[in-house]
Amino acid sequence: MLVPKRVKHRREFRGKMRGEAKGGKEVAFGEWGLQATESHWITNRQIEAARIAMTRYMKRGGKVWIKIFPHKSYTSKAIGVRMGKGKGAPEGWVSPVKRGKIMFEIAGVPEEVAREALRLASHKLPVKTKIVKREEMGGESNEG
């Protein structure tokens, strides 16, 4: 699973998720990409589940690029603990993904295989997505 090797601060502020992604809005490496159409935190487990779903469907053929990395820690308090007494312990790692960001890219497989692999990956993620091709940035929407 993806986790940072070393961080300066273990506990981070939550931050805001306003606006669109500043960069990473075009397909850069592969032929097909999975683009987020809404903003959300994506955990390292969700990224790994999507990666496994894609590679299994492609039968280890082609190449997959993961364009997001979970660099932000999130905390939670134990169940039954009252309010106050400081911030909770680090629980896991997330990648804040804004609207328009390309999360995964695929190359080296036929169009039908790429579309189905990205569709399967989109069901593992908590955001609405669309499948985009390298040339035209229109795309097929997956509201679900």
From Swiss-Prot:
One Pfam family hit: Ribosomal_L16
Any GO molecular function: tRNA binding
GO CC term (a single one): cytosolic large ribosomal subunit
Keywords for the protein's UniProt record, in alphabetical order: Ribonucleoprotein, Ribosomal protein, RNA-binding, rRNA-binding, tRNA-binding
GO biological process: translation
PROSITE patterns reported for this sequence: RIBOSOMAL_L16_1 (PS00586), RIBOSOMAL_L16_2 (PS00701)
InterPro entries from the UniProt entry: Ribosomal_uL16, Ribosomal_uL16_bact-type, Ribosomal_uL16_CS, Ribosomal_uL16_dom, Ribosomal_uL16_sf
Annotated function: Binds 23S rRNA and is also seen to make contacts with the A and possibly P site tRNAs.
Complex formation: Part of the 50S ribosomal subunit.
Family named by the database record: Belongs to the universal ribosomal protein uL16 family.
Name of this chain's protein: Large ribosomal subunit protein uL16
The gene coding this protein: rplP
